[in-house]
Structure formats: structure tokens, C-alpha cells
Amino acid sequence: MYVKVNPSSYSVAIYEIAKESNKIKTFHEQFSFVKKVIEKNPQLITFLKNDEIALEKRFELIDEIFGSLEVDVKNSIKVALVRNMIFVLRKIIVDFLKITNYELGIKFAKVITAYPLSDSELEKIQKKLNEKTKKIVEISTEVDEKLLSGYKIIFSNQLYERNYNNDLQKIKKTIIKGKEDEK
């Protein structure tokens, strides 16, 4: 039997609950946490999808893992479980976060460096971006050893970079252009 699934309607419903209870920021933070947990532990969704395990046991696991979260956040996960929507829980959360990102004025930046950044370095970058944009900026990081040193920041379709690899590429282009001009 074919069942049509619309994760966006669940996301909007969760948003409405958050808005009615004046807890949009709290829900945003808590669903961000839930998203990280299910991304780091894909076996959790596999366990929750397993109909051979009693529903009560699966509810207990949700309460155990997410016990400190708002009741409505936990209940949203349980509703997805009962309605056989747990396999799209991540999509529901992503859609919800997109709605709340807009509502809360949150922007995103990707910081690519040659080595892992410390928490204090990330905080400095985030603070600088927050000040520059007058928005809340959430940062994701990536390590790219080809940079040799320095960084790239991708933010709002703009690229800011200061790294040796980029400098070497510019020098290379200048040298090649110079040789072509000599001919």
C-alpha cells in the first residue's frame, strides 16, 4: 500500500506549537540537538522504526535520550513514531529549522580551514560575523589540508578567503600571464 508522506505539514504544526507557547528559540535549539543526535546515531532511527519492538519500549528510549527536552519536543518525536513517520524525522526537523531560522534571523556560514579550529577560534569568528551582519550566525566547519594555511569562509553566497593555496594560485596565474605577454 502506498502512503503519501508530507513532512512539511508536520514541521509547520510543530512551528505553530512553538509559536503558541512562545518557545520558538527553545524548540529551535532542542530540535537542532535532536538532529545532531540522529545524524551521529543512525541506528536510533533504525531502532525506532522496528515494529517488532514494543511501542512502549521505543517511547522509553525517546524519554531516556531526550528526557531534558520540552515535553512538546519529545511528543513531536513520538507522534512521528506513532504515525509511521519516524523514517522522515530528520526531514521534518530540517524543515522546522528552516522555518525557525527565518523567524529568528539566523544565517549560516561554512568555515574551511587547513586544520581543526579550537572552540575559542570558532567563537571569535562567530562573534565577528554576528557583529558584521547584525544577525545570529551558525557556523559549520570543514578541514581542507589543501589550503596549507589560512581559511575560507562561505557566507550568503560570498567567499572570503585568506590562505597560502589561494595566494600561490594567484602567483601562478601572474607568472603564466607574464610568460604569455613575453611571446
Curated annotation (Swiss-Prot):
Keyword set includes Cell membrane: yes
Keyword Cell wall biogenesis/degradation carried by entry: no
A Gene Ontology term for the protein's cellular component: plasma membrane
Disulphide bonds in the chain: none
Subcellular location(s) per record: Cell membrane
Membrane topology: Peripheral membrane protein
Gene3D superfamilies listed in its UniProt record: N-terminal domain of the delta subunit of the F1F0-ATP synthase
Signal peptide limits: none
UniProtKB keywords: ATP synthesis, Cell membrane, CF(1), Hydrogen ion transport, Ion transport, Membrane, Transport
UniProt xrefs under SUPFAM superfamilies: N-terminal domain of the delta subunit of the F1F0-ATP synthase (SSF47928)
Single Gene Ontology MF annotation: proton-transporting ATP synthase activity, rotational mechanism
Protein family (similarity comment): Belongs to the ATPase delta chain family.
Cited function: F(1)F(0) ATP synthase produces ATP from ADP in the presence of a proton or sodium gradient. F-type ATPases consist of two structural domains, F(1) containing the extramembraneous catalytic core and F(0) containing the membrane proton channel, linked together by a central stalk and a peripheral stalk. During catalysis, ATP synthesis in the catalytic domain of F(1) is coupled via a rotary mechanism of the central stalk subunits to proton translocation.
Cited NCBIfam families: ATP_synt_delta
Subunit: F-type ATPases have 2 components, F(1) - the catalytic core - and F(0) - the membrane proton channel. F(1) has five subunits: alpha(3), beta(3), gamma(1), delta(1), epsilon(1). F(0) has three main subunits: a(1), b(2) and c(10-14). The alpha and beta chains form an alternating ring which encloses part of the gamma chain. F(1) is attached to F(0) by a central stalk formed by the gamma and epsilon chains, while a peripheral stalk is formed by the delta and b chains.
Name of the featured protein: ATP synthase subunit delta
Organism annotation: Mycoplasmopsis synoviae (strain 53)
Lineage: Bacteria, Bacillati, Mycoplasmatota, Mycoplasmoidales, Metamycoplasmataceae
Gene encoding the protein: atpH
